Structures are given as structure tokens and as C-alpha cells.
Amino acid sequence: MPSSLKLLSNLIAESVDKIEQRCAAQGVPFPELNEVLSFQSEAIRSDTDVAEAIQVIAASAAQLLATAMSPIATLSVVAHQWDVPACLGAANDANVAEILRDAGPKGAHIDDIAKRNGTNAGRLGRVLRLLASHHIFREVSPDVFANNRISSLLDSKKPVEELEKNPQSKYTETSLVNTFVSFGAGEFFKGGAFLSETLRDPVFGHSDEANHSAFNKAFKFDVSFFEWMERPENKDVLSRFSLMMRATTDLLPDAAILNGFDFGSLPDGALVVDVAGGIGSLSMVLAKTFPKLNFVVEDRPQLASDAEPYWKSNLPEALESGRVRLVAHDMFTPQPDLGSPVDVFVLRGILHDWADSYGIRLLSHLRAAAGPQTKLVVIEILLESPCRDPETSTIKGCEPRTVPEPLLANMGAADSVDYSMDMMMMGFGNGQERTLRHYVKILSETGWELKEVIHIDSLHIGPLRPHLIAVPV
């Protein structure tokens, strides 16, 4: 039998062949890393065969490294990977991508970069060299750096002078990716440093409370992350967070919403409630696509007030006609009387913010407000175990996926962002991503039955969150 090394290398070679065959068939090259990003050139990644091959390459390459490298080398790399997000955050805050945009493909010397952002040239150069070693930016000649396909995503498209005068101006509708980087390399990263202390704390380590998290230890406050953001002194954080939540929809194709639950099957005048929907970016996609459906977007008062200008700018007639209503509501209290039966409750990226006791409270209130025709649509990550599960589910859409040996059953590094998200949720509020079994459990405990899981086709941005469809019992 071939060794693991050989099996893994074969998977990579076979997957590369598949990609090149699809590129040849479509008459396009595969995007080169050293080129600046253009979304047109990325289109090939949305090909189903290419997307699947990329997943196999990512999983195989990471497992091949773990197999080939010595254990001490692997542990050393992992233990010191704090430096990558730290350096990424530093480069983002220093507007390096924008400076290099102005420099073009020839790049700029670190001395010239430092003059424009006021940093120490030697230290910033070391930051960029580490990132370039991880294929973020490229060093075209000693101490001369340029953008590549990955780093160019950090470019906010704003003038450097404007960003230096007003750093917060980086985080606007034109630069939604920066909000992910800002939180991932900032607030979430700092909170993660206190994971060990929190896990071993006799109180925090066993608490479901959102104010007993690693984030609380890191930033030394005693309210939940959401309450902390709403304090006047943290208005810039709240603004960035709102943009990040909007980005979770705006950066995804409409298929992430439209190719799941069949909203088109609802009768004219049906009511869809977007629970904790923020400014309503998900409902915006649905309202534009299904003009005969009605929508209510619920969230905390501060976020609900932020939603009004968003709708007035993008679909004012929906507000004016009353087809879309923005309602301030605490989701952990009983649902308000909305004047008509609810056909669909939508929870997108909400349950993962909270521990089970809070999730059960929310689901129970929705069940109490549900009628016999009501559907519950939960749009969340479904975690899988790295091991192969001998049990199979009878729920529609939950058939185990076929993964080639010797890859991990959950595709390992290819889907590692899901497990990183799980740690992020635990770190900033004791929330969590869940497995299928876990969702079946909390839904059944609150009077819901999971009937179907609809998986959205993988695109060049990676697998999209599935839609879990439940009905009252």
C-alpha cells in the first residue's frame, strides 16, 4: 500500500490536473499569486470542479506538511503563529496596501513606505518580510515590497493621506474586508490570548454568561461584548462591527441566501422575520428578489436605528410602503405582536454568538410565537469531526460527504476557518459553532424538529453556510 506521503502528493497532483483541465476548457489561466487581485480573474474558482479540487489541495497540502515535518518543527510553527495576525493587523493599520497600490508592480522601498505612514522603517520591513514569507505581500528585491493577490484585498481604495488623517475612514462600504482583518487581528486576537486563563478559571471556565469570556479578561470589563460596543466611547468599534456584519452578506453571492430555503414558495404577503438581523442586509437581498413578501428586521435599539439610513439609501420604497419594518427588540424576550402570523423566522449567524442556555431561551420564544405553518431557517456553520462517524443521519441533506483517504473526514485545513470561528465565538462571549447532533438536540428541546439541511454549492470564497430548516412539533 502506498505511504501517506505518496497518497497525499497524488491527491495534490490529481487536483492540479483537474484545475488545469477546467482552465483549458474555459480558455482562462488560473490566477497567479504575484498578480494584483481582479475579481474577473477569480471567476474560475467558482467552477464546481475547480472549487472541489481546491478543497482537496488545501486539505492534502496541510496534512502533507504535518506528515513530512518533524513534530517539534510543527509545534514550533504553531506555537509562534501569533505573529501572523499581529503583523497583518499592523500592516493594515499602517495602510501598507494603499501605499503599495500607489507604487505599482515595481513596489516601494521600505524607507519610502515608512515616510508615508510614520513608522520605523526597519521594524515595518521585518513585519512585511514575515508576511511575505506567508505569501501576503511580496518582496520583489531586498527591502522593496509590492502587493500581490492576497495583500491587494487590504486596499481600501482610499487615498493614503486621507487614511493617515482619519484612520477610521478605512472602514467604510468600499473596504469591507478591512473590517474582518481589523477584528481578527485586533479585538478577537487580543481576547484569544486569554483563552487558557479563562478555560481554567473556576467561574468563567464553566459559565454560559456572555460577560464571563476571554474577551472580558483581556479588556477588563464586566458586560457582554455587544453591550460594551454600545458604550459611547466604543462607537467606532460598533461602527466597524456593523460593517463587518454587513460584509458577511455583501461579500457573499446572493446564492448564499437564495439557493437555500425556497423563499419563492411562500404565498404573496407572507411575513419573514429576520431575527437579530442587524441593519437587515439579508432581508435586503430577499426584499429585492421577492417583492410580494413582507419583512420585519428585529435587533437591539442601537442597531435597529442604524438600519433606517441603510434602507432609505438602498430600497426606500420598501420602508415607505410598510413592506419592510424595522423593529427594536430584545430577542431573549417574547416576540412582539407583529399583526399577522409569521411564516418564516430567519436566524443567520445568531445562535453561534451564544451558549446553549441563551440559544434555548431564544428558540423557545420563537416557538411560542410560531404557528403551524411557520418555518425556522437557521443559517450557521455545521462543524464535523476529523474522525469518520459510523452513524448516519436520516435528516434530508445530512448524508456524509465522500472524502478521499487519507484526508481527515472534515477536510482538515480546507475548512479550518470554521473551527477558528468556533474559538472566536467562545472567546468573545461564550458562544459556539455546533455539530449536526448539537443542533438536533437544542432544537428538539425547544419544540422544533430539524427536517432538512440545504448545503450551498462551494464557490471561490469557500463553502457557504448551510440552511437548517426546522418546523414546530
UniProtKB/Swiss-Prot annotation:
State the protein's purpose.
Answer: O-methyltransferase, part of the gene cluster that mediates the biosynthesis of melleolides, a range of antifungal and phytotoxic polyketide derivatives composed of an orsellinic acid (OA) moiety esterified to various sesquiterpene alcohols. The first step in melleolides biosynthesis is performed by the delta(6)-protoilludene synthase PRO1 which catalyzes the cyclization of farnesyl diphosphate to protoilludene. The orsellinic acid synthase armB produces OA by condensing acetyl-CoA with 3 malonyl-CoA units in a three-round chain elongation reaction folowed by a C2-C7 ring closure.
The alphabetical list of record keywords is: Methyltransferase, S-adenosyl-L-methionine, Transferase
| Enzyme Commission identifier(s) | 2.1.1.-
Q: What is this protein called?
A: O-methyltransferase ARMGADRAFT_1088206
Coiled coil ranges (UniProt) are none
Q: Does the keyword DNA damage apply?
A: no
Q: Which GO terms describe its molecular function?
A: O-methyltransferase activity; protein dimerization activity
The active site is formed by: H352 (proton acceptor)
- Note the biotech application: Melleolide sesquiterpene aryl esters are cytotoxic secondary products with anti-cancer potential. Armillaridin shows therapeutic and radiosensitizing effects on human esophageal cancer cells. Armillaridin induces autophagy-associated cell death in human chronic myelogenous leukemia as well as of hepatocellular carcinoma cells. Armillaridin can also inhibit the differentiation and activation of human macrophages and thus might have potential to be developed as a biological response modifier for inflammatory diseases.
Q: Which Pfam families match?
A: Dimerisation, Methyltransf_2
Q: Quick one: which residues bind S-adenosyl-L-methionine?
A: A276, G277, D299, D330, M331, R348
* Alphabetical list of Gene3D superfamilies matching this protein: Vaccinia Virus protein VP39, Winged helix-like DNA-binding domain superfamily/Winged helix DNA-binding domain
Other noteworthy facts = Armillaria species are both devastating forest pathogens and some of the largest and oldest terrestrial organisms on Earth. They forage for hosts and achieve immense colony sizes via rhizomorphs, root-like multicellular structures of clonal dispersal. One genetic Armillaria gallica individual localized in Michigan's Upper Peninsula stands out as exceptionally large, covering hundreds of tree root systems over approximately 75 hectares of the forest floor. Based on observed growth rates of the fungus, the minimum age of this large individual can be estimated as 2500 years.
> What InterPro entries does this protein's entry cite?
COMT-like, O_MeTrfase_dom, Plant_O-MeTrfase_dimerisation, SAM-dependent_MTases_sf, WH-like_DNA-bd_sf, WH_DNA-bd_sf
Pathway terms, separated by semicolons: Secondary metabolite biosynthesis
Q: Which family does it belong to?
A: Belongs to the class I-like SAM-binding methyltransferase superfamily. Cation-independent O-methyltransferase family.
An individual GO BP term: methylation
Keyword Nuclease applies: no
The source organism is: Armillaria gallica
